[in-house]
Amino acid sequence: MANCSDLSFYDQDYFDRGCQSGKSNYVDYSWERIGGEVEKTAVHIIKHFAPAKSLDVGCAKGFIVKALYDRGVDAYGIDASEYAILKVPEEVSDRVKLGLASDLTYKSNEFDLVTIFDVLEHIPEELTDQTCAELLRISSNWVLVYVVTRHEPDDIDPTHINIKPREWWEAKFVELGGKICSINDIYNPNIWWFNLADRLIRVKK
């Protein structure tokens, strides 16, 4: 997660007891419980994007980083939660660091794929331009976005502060120099982060 005014909010209660604590929609955010689904996502990403070097922005406990790295991708991650970073799997712990989506300390064009799943809805609107510009800056090819685009009655996460329609986000990336591409070939109702078309945005650098 990223850029909440109090980043300590993203703690163990947020990730592992979210519904119970009222902090988030998460329940037991662990590799043992969701690793299989994350691996399916990694296979899907490799099939459609074949990244050589990737960055997952808002990577939480680094599960996408692990799943891609295990399959030969030079994968990295960044997250604003100190708790989540401490829980990154040991084999990729040196590939994940603490940081903000609005200030990505990487070289321009460093990654051919940048993913940002379930993060932009946490970014204050006044930081939206800066964040989206950073995503485009560090990518040499693709930025893949999955973002909450409407208020859902069962969404209890109070840090979902920037919920806008998909078209709003698409226009933002175009304004900053990106090109919106079709998701028809990557949408899949059975793959996490590719399963809701109104949340999925594919941006070409």
Task: Spell out what each predicted region is.
Residues 1-108, 115, 127-132, 149, ...:
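Conserved N-terminal segment of class I S-adenosyl-L-methionine
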Residues 113-119:
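A short beta-strand submotif of the Rossmann-like class I SAM-dependent methyltransferase core
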Residues 122-123:
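A short His-aromatic
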Residues 135:
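Class I S-adenosylmethionine-dependent transferase superfamily signal
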Residues 140-149:
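Conserved beta-strand signature within the Rossmann-like core of class I S-adenosyl-L-methionine
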Residues 176-178:
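A structural motif corresponding to the C-terminal end of an alpha-helix
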Residues 204-205:
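C-terminal lobe and adjacent flexible extensions of AdoMet/dcAdoMet transferase-like proteins
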